[in-house]
Amino acid sequence: VSDYLRGEQIMELKGTKTEKNLMEAFAGESMARNKYTYFASVAKKEGYEQLAAIFEETAGNEKEHAKMWFKALCGGSIPDTLTCLDMAASGENEEWTDMYPRMAAEAKEEGFTQLAALFTMVGQIEKEHEARYRALAANLKEGKVFAREEQQVWVCRNCGYTYIGKSAPLKCPVCAHPQSYFELKARNY
């Protein structure tokens, strides 16, 4: 987490007040980061570049604070990518199966029909997010991130080089970036 906390014995947080406080600190810092990013955008549009830069700098600070609390909640470090994909899918599932339907029902009950509709529509987006994370996790488990059974068009996300083959190149022949920069080329135009 930080040098300050490294010497602390890792204790079981589950169910403690400290766990609750870490979750509150993580949520608070995360929300502050987003708000300050929005505030920076407004300041920039209104012609206040210095104020925008200060909001952006502070947002970056809040991001690091949130990361520190999140790491503490995760036992000292952020988990591996597969675990992160599973955590993300579970979070998205909770949002579209429980949180947004409940919020939509409550908003409708209180007469906020437009907000109820927005809660419902965002819930559908979260359902798509869950599906995407689950598909990505399956690709990772099955070794299909950079290899497929049939020829594909792969594109380097750094320089745009395209390659046709069953696997992405180990290294881009144009910019020398590693295979990790390749993805399947998608055409949406």
Name each model-derived stretch.
Residues 3-4:
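Intrinsic-disorder-associated, low-complexity terminal segments enriched in Asp/Asn/His/Tyr and depleted
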Residues 7-189:
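Non-heme di-metal
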